């Protein structure tokens, strides 16, 4: 889980809206679930960058037909999107483009689309903010690497000292780099996926929802999240877990729990603890549960492997 931590170091530079809890400014990637090295700085919606992950989808990144017949087919990338010619495939996820090269199978884009549509369902204001910020999701082929994604192709130059292609199989969207990425092998739950057990897309897209959507729709969100996080830490919760890293990873790990796409560890192992489901989150950290409940549907849908 070392990738994510680096991400928030990159997050120190962002362009999302400032509020009373954090300043603006910046361009780099944000932390994501599944990392473990030492952190340099914390990332946030107000700091905005790309959240990085080395987590995987044990329960998968797809599952459940999206509403209204969305995510039914893959097409060419509309020219009006103005995207890099690297992208050849496209699916519309309620206004959020899901794109890839020719490499990934169509099934990977369709399952990513399904997850995005379901996660965005309840809050149209957040979705509209994300659309206005040109948020998109890029699906890497199993044979592709992070720097193949055009929005992330400069990471080695912008943030030297990290081997992004080795360490990251997913990054979250920020105003400077508005693509969230995920990987074919994780989305489709291949046996070869080294990160089975978690869902990169759920974790990373939850960062994008916060950074590219909620922070614009609700300018006080960062402060509220910070207060909830600080209260949990002061109460001794999330000790020896990745959720304790900063408010952004606290949020993303909580969203994974909400969708039952996290890993359980008893005792805590520095990354996870015994909390990995919505019901357990409600009992363990009610303020975080209730904050998340404002943005995601409290229904029976969960991502699932094909």
Question: Which residues fall in each region the model found?
Answer:
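Acidic/His-rich structured neighborhood in mature extracellular/periplasmic domains
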Residues: 69, 78, 85-86, 93-96, ...
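Short secondary-structure subsegments characteristic of cysteine-rich extracellular domains
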Residues: 6-7, 281
